[in-house]
Structure formats: structure tokens, C-alpha cells
Amino acid sequence: MGDTATMFCFQCEQTAGCTGCTGATGVCGKQASTAVLQDEVTGALVALARTVRAAGMNGDARRTADDLAMEGLFATLTNVDFDDAALADLLARVHAERDSVAASAQVGAAPDYDLAMLWNAPEDARSLKSLVLFGLRGLAAYAYHAAALGYRDDAVSSFLHEGLAALADDEADADVLLPLSLKVGEVNLRCMELLDRANTETFGTPEPTTVTRAVEAGPFIVVSGHDLHDLKLLLDQTEGRGVNVYTHGELLPAHAYPELKRYAHLKGNVGTAWQSQRVEFADLPAPVLFTTNCLMPPAASYADRVFTTGPVAYPGMMHVEAAPDGGKDFEPLIQRALELGGYAAATDTTGTFTTGFGHSAVLGVADTVVDAVKQGALSGYFLVGGCDGARPGRSYFRDFVQQAPDDSIILTLACGKFRFNDLDLGTIGGLPRIMDMGQCNDAYGAIRVAVALAEAFDCGVNDLPLTLVLSWYEQKAVSILLTLLHLGIRGIYLGPTLPAFVSPGVLDVLVREFDVRPITTPEEDLKAILA
């Protein structure tokens, strides 16, 4: 193991000084030892990928390596795995699989890649390799979710190994790395389509749904993260037990899926986006289950009520492991809910959220939209969404939505929606002016809508009355941005700050070739958009 006294990490939007976290602790709360282990896991995954490719492994023979690539890349996302013991175990499993592949194929086992080689590479090479690596982490998260529902794509799995192996090429320059970055976006589009199909074929097609923010009296559990499969398992095990279930954060869109909303004890949504959890959970008389990411170091006020599962882990927290068949026993979580008892009386929280405007729902009213635009009743669309975060500059997105023309519609997705989804902006032609399309991976749905509208108007996507205003925080946002660039979508407004890992040289390419635009103020940006 390397030097655990210091770290280097600049993969998230809140990285220290907009340059990188160094020293003993990162802004996200992970310790230097954790950051070092995450780098070691990544370096081991590069070695596994190189060994798998040398062995010419494909299909089912590569299944264990594929699963480790998904799990390992996911575990190194921001706000996922803070547990050194869990990461050390993962590292050992990656090494064991690499050695097994090498032995069975009679090829040499590739050595671990030292991430310091990447962090200390020439500026533009470091920037482009970081785009590839962080994009792969986001892509792997979506592949992990699809695989949990039994949906896999060999082309996606194969590319994870291809992309990882490419990181070890110290001679790769911009001519190699920029196309590779865009290929991450191409494969991520394919993976988001896979996950969309997995979700809709398993849980039904999302439909517009109103979700209460109030909590009923009695025992309950709050589920955070993104994992619909884990939520379904918990709903099955709590049915008839007198324990209600509430979503949090990115799981709000779960209420729109027919196979989930049929559970009478899936009651509503507690709280808002991930960065507010230390306040929102402080006095909660219920346990919280974290699925996938969005975990912050728990405050002492509620640490004894935190459960984790899947790739999420934190030292000292109860972790629910998956059985070999994929099942999970949530009985300890349920018992904790019964012990805590919930609220003695229903909360007086007012207001509702509306979700479920996925691509099927929006395309179902496409004729209305097209007619409204042609008749001048609708000036256009704004897609305002992405990751939320704690930086004060994120108030931009609420201000932007409030100042957008009254005859425009706001599409939104991911947890960035919580900046403004409490607003009542009225309707246009019977359509709500704010339409929540779902989780971050539902960017695929937004792309489908854009392509369909372009066909209806007989124009290119860039010619539509559609502007993308995106907030980013972690690596899934990177993979989505790369998908949009792969599709040739131009004029994307990005904020609240630019990624620290994007060098001036790479930024120049993004601005010149793709017209990526750092946000300024809502007033100035709207003036430019509407000119």
C-alpha cells in the first residue's frame, strides 16, 4: 500500500479550491487512506483489464471480471465507499481474479497501474485520461444497476476493460484520448438505453405521479440512493409488517413506476437532495437505507440508524450483503424501524412533488408540444438538471428557472431538480411547466425526446428551441456530458464551476469544438439564449 498520509483527488465538483483535495481528508469526508485505496483498486482494475484483454476472454468466461470492473469502478465514485476494510477486500478480489485469468489463459498477469502516473502526467494528457476514467466510473454505475436487474450488454462490459487498459498507455496523446473520451459517451448512451429497458420492463413505464412530502404516524424506513431493485426487495419484505417506506433524493422517481407504486406502504418522499441529509436525518425517528451512492459521513445524531447495501459502505455502519442469488435480508433494518417507532402523529409537512414525465409520457404529448411551438404558444424548452451539491453558486439554477420565459417548459432530471421542483409555474396548454423526467440516467429519455422533436420539426437537435443547462457534481454527470458531446449536441451551459480536471487546453477544445459554455448569471445566460 502506498503513502496513506496524503491524498490527491479532484474528481468531484466540490474539490478543494477547485484544484484538488490533498492532505489527510477530502472535502467529501473520505480519509487519505481511503483515497489511496481507491487509487489502488483502480490500478488493480487496469491490471485486470489488461490481463483479460491479453487472454482474449469474452462472454460468460469474463463474467467475474466484468462484475469486478463494475463494482470496483462504482466503489470509487464520490460518496459511495468510505470503508477501508471493504476496499481492501475488493482490492484482494480484483488481484485474485487477475491471477486466475492469467493462470487459466497462460498469459502474464499485468502489474497494477500506479495512478500517480496519471495524476503527474502532462497537463492535457492528465485531463483527458481523467475524463476517460471518471466517465468510466459513471458508465460502470449504470451497468451495475442494469446487471442487478439481469440486463447485460457484452459491448458495454468489454468497453470497460478497453477503457481501463488504455489508461496504462503512457504514450497516448490527445489524438488517441479525445476520441476515447467520446467513445465513453457513445457506450454510456448504449448503457443508459439498457438501464432504461431494464427499469421499464421490470417495473413498468413511468407515469406522471404526485408524491406527498408528509410522513404518516408509525414506523417507517427512508431509502436513499438510486437502486430500484433494492427498493423493490425492501417493499416485498415490509409488506404487511406495519412499516411504511419513504424515498429520498434520487429515488423520488420510483413512485412513478407502476410495479412500485402498487405497494400501498410506499407512502411518499422525505427530504430533498443528498447534500442536505445531515440536517434532514438528524431527528428522524427511523432508519435510513443507502443504496448505491449519495452517502455523506453520518453525523452522530443519526449514525446508529444508518444501513448500507450494495457498493455503499461506511465504517461502523450496518451493511446488508447480497446472497449468492441476489436476495437481501432486510430484517435488521425492519426491526430497527419497529424499535424506533416513527412519529407519534403525522407530520405537518405540506406540499407535494410531481414526477414520472419520462420519455414515454413526454412523447405521448409530442403533437401538442409541436403544435404549441408552431402556433407561438410555446417558445421552447429548457433542460435544467443534473447533480445537486452544497456550493452556494447552485442557487443559479433556481433563479434561472424562475426567470425563464413564462411560455417555456422546464424539463428536469436527477437531484438537481430539488433546487426548484417545489415551484408552481403553472401550465401551458394543459402541460405542467416543470416536468421531472426521472433519475440522472434518464438523460437517455431526454435524448430520445430531443431526437423525436427534431424529427417532428424536420431539423437537427441543435436547431431545436431547446437549451441544456446542466449542473454537475460527480462522475455520472461526466459520463452523461460525454454522451451529449458524442451526439454532437452544442451550446451546453455547465456549472456551477468547471471540472478541476479539465485543463485549459482541453477546455479550449470543448469550447471551440462543442461550444460548451460555463454558466455566468441567469440574467446574462438567458439574454444570450433568447437573443
Where are the regions a protein language model picked out?
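Electropositive, gly/pro-rich neighborhoods at or near active sites that engage anionic ligands
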Residues: 45-205
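Anaerobic metallocofactor- and corrinoid-dependent redox/one-carbon enzyme cores
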Residues: 2-34, 38-39, 46-47, 57, ...
